Structures are given as structure tokens and as C-alpha cells.
Amino acid sequence: MDKETGKAARSASGRKITESVEFVAEGKDGTAEVEFVFDGSNLAGKTLVAFEKLYYGDKLYAVHTDLEDEDQTIHVPAAGTTASDKNTGTHHAYAGEYVELTDTIEYRNLLPGETYTLHGTVVEKETEQRLSEEKQQEFIPEKADGSIEIAFEINGTDLSGKTAVIYEEIKIDGKSIAEHKNPEAKEQSIYFPKIGTKAMDKKSKTQEGDAREKQTIIDQVSYENLLPGETYILKGVLMDKADGKEMTDKNNRKITGRTTFTPEKSAGTVEMTFELDARELGGKAVVVFENLYDEEDHLIADEANIDNADQTIIYKNNEKSAVSPKINTDNPKPSSSIRKSPKTGVENHTFLWMLTLGSLGTAVAAGIAIYRKKRD
């Protein structure tokens, strides 16, 4: 019987749980065993009470149908888990070398004062390969219902784009009485997002741009293993490949981009735009770095490889687009100590005409002097 409802309990197949046994009494007092075998996977957390009736032939001789009799009662424990990343406090985690996870196990229908052992393991969802050693933790519940936490440390370096699931099992005297091992359960899962980028110059539609004043970089950011309906923040910054430092504009501000989005599916793309003055970038390479954050601004994925060609825009040399140098107007007159170089063009022609006229004048003067001498 289901103690909560007072009705006959039913197995996972939907059938009432009944059993009967015939026996021959060897004396006026004795015992007989009745064994119930059924699929009870649907009864986690339930309290079952065995009702017994004794017949001799078709005649009812005795009954024992007390819902409050503890000796007839079976407590079916239940366990549910909620996994979270210690850093984010959510089901998202950054795929770093050291990842701390916390699993909160909520149990029901345990026996207060008894000693139980909690067994937990972290596995990779697709392969169910272990990501941690099995952890064991003893506890003695004060009440039938309650919760207990267990912590795990794993290496998440290779988990970008993958999902980790925490499996839990409660045992008493070495026997399993409750477990939660569903690889599809979101509550048990930790999601490690993954992003990739493909940058291009807006005008050329390639990864090569012109070193001109107003230039635009469009970055197509692909994502994997996000939770549909959740809110995410994408932040980007432009990097100078030569020195690996963040680029700044004329006001010494970083050249950044930012967008917020809510994916409809776990995988997809989102676009980021960057505006910059590229006049001084001829022959240089610009690399786009992207960081993905959850709604609470926790970093959960990034793409920050300075040598990634897909993230790189190269600007061609363009002499016409070079920034004009500043002219110093404070001292327009040249110093007298500086020797002037001969000029070319029209001014040079004037110099030649003056030289020619000077020569002719000298010749005429000399001729007049000779003529006067002869007359004398």
C-alpha cells in the first residue's frame, strides 16, 4: 500500500503489487515469508506498507492492515542532485586546468540515525568516461529528508564544448538504496561552452584590409554547448599581433565590441563589429580576441590565440592613406646657419637667365672700354 494515499501501490508497469504463498503450519504458532518482486523504479521516495490477509480455503481467518505499523513499512529512499561550478554558481564552467564542482544531493525517506555512504563520480556525458575518482562521504541524517554536499576537482582543459555529468549513489551496509545516474538530466550536468571566430574586413570580405581611416572588422563567432533560453554576453577586443598587446585609438581607449544574445539552440553563430582607424596599420596584423560570459558576467569560454589565422586581419601598405605629418609653424624663417640647397624648376630657370644677362652686360662693358682706348 502507498502510505501517503492509502491506496494500493503500483509498480512501474502500472500493476498492483500483490503476492501470495501457501504454507503448512507445523504448529499453532510460527512464521511464513511472503516475497514481493516488482519493478519499483517509479516508487522512489515512497513509503510502502504491507497488508496481509490469512485465508483457510476461502474463509478469511486474520488480517493485518495497519498503515501506521512501522514493522510492516518499507521506506524507499530517493535522491536528486543539483550540480554547479564553484566559480560561476551555475551549470556553466570555463574549460580550465582546475575546475571545482559542487553537487548538492537532496534525499528523501531515509532513516534518521542510520549511517549512510554517499558515492559520487564525474563522467563525460557522451562517452561516460570518468573525469574524477569516486568520492565517498559518510553521513547520518537527523531527519528522513534533507541534503548533503560533495565536492569534486577535475581537469577541464580538454572539455571545451563538452558536458560533464555527476553520478550519485547512496548505500547502507554496502547495499545501494538510491541513485541518480541520468546523463540527460540538466540538474546533474555541467556545460563547458566553446567558441570559435572568423574575422574579415567588411569591404573586401577577406582577411586583408586597406590601411585607411574608417575601417570595419566583422567577426563571426560560432558557439557550442550553450543552454537555449539563457542570456549570454560576448565581449571582444582588437590585439596588435606584433607585441601581443591590446590596441588603442587616438584617445588611448581600447578598441572593443560587445553584444548580448539569447540562443534558441545550443549551437549557432553571432556577429561582432569593430570600428577602427587603420591609417597607421600598413603592413601590420590585427587579431580579434573574444570572451564569452554568462548573465552574471562569469567567463565561460574564450578564443584568444594570437597566432590564429582565422582571427587575423592584415592591412596593406597604402602611401596615400598615410597620416600627414604635423607642420611646425612656430618658427617659419630658416636659420641663417643652414646652407640652402639649389632649387629646381621655375626658380632655377630664373637663376640661369640672370646669369646669362650678367654675362652679356659684362661683355658689352668690356667692348665699350676697348673702343674708347682705340680712339684715344
Can you annotate each of these PLM segments?
Residues 25-37, 143-153, 264-275:
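Aromatic sugar-binding surface patches on proteins
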Residues 316-347:
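C-terminal low-complexity, Ser/Thr- and acidic/Pro-rich disordered "stalk" regions positioned immediately N-terminal
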Residues 60-78, 176-193, 298-321:
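Short beta-strand elements
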Residues 344-358:
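Juxtamembrane/start-of-transmembrane alpha-helix segments at the extracytoplasmic/lumenal side
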Residues 80-91, 196-207, 328, 342:
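Short, solvent-exposed loop/edge segments of extracellular or virion-exposed proteins
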Residues 92-104, 206-220:
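Contiguous beta-strand segments within globular domains
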Residues 361-376:
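C-terminal membrane-anchoring or membrane-association module
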Residues 38-50, 157-166, 278-288:
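Short glycine/proline/serine/threonine-rich loop/turn segments at secondary-structure transition edges
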